[in-house]
Amino acid sequence: MRVQVYWNLHKMCWSVVALEGEDKGRVIDYVNYFAITNATLVVQPAGQARVRLEGKKNVHAFVRGEVESLGWTREQHRGWRRIRYNPYRDACFMQDLMPDEWVDGIPVLPVNWAARVDLEPGAIAWAYKAEWR
């Protein structure tokens, strides 16, 4: 099932929105842990501009893809990267790099797709095989 997931600042958990089926467009669950495969990391520019203009957050960034798991299942693999998004600083999701991977002293790279994204409490997200497409 295709969904999009975002960090809910009011409930302090992940909100899961159905992208297909009879509940399309509706929040179908609130979870602490979630895994998505074939994940697209989306930032809507108009929503981001509004955040910067008004100084208060709105839902405009999310992870979209196929449901993998509602529970904690992340296996430790080489290649997992922490990903994050700051609407006041970044135009897209960014992946943290190890010091030996920095490019011109920059510790992050943009990312908009990953083979899998695991979401944890506290708005923490991990991506496996993350890249810019």
Regions found by a protein language model. Give the residues of each.
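Short intrinsically disordered terminal tails
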Residues: 1, 130-133
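Structural detector for short beta-strands of small beta-barrel domains
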Residues: 1-8
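Acidic, low-complexity, intrinsically disordered interaction modules
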Residues: 11, 15-123
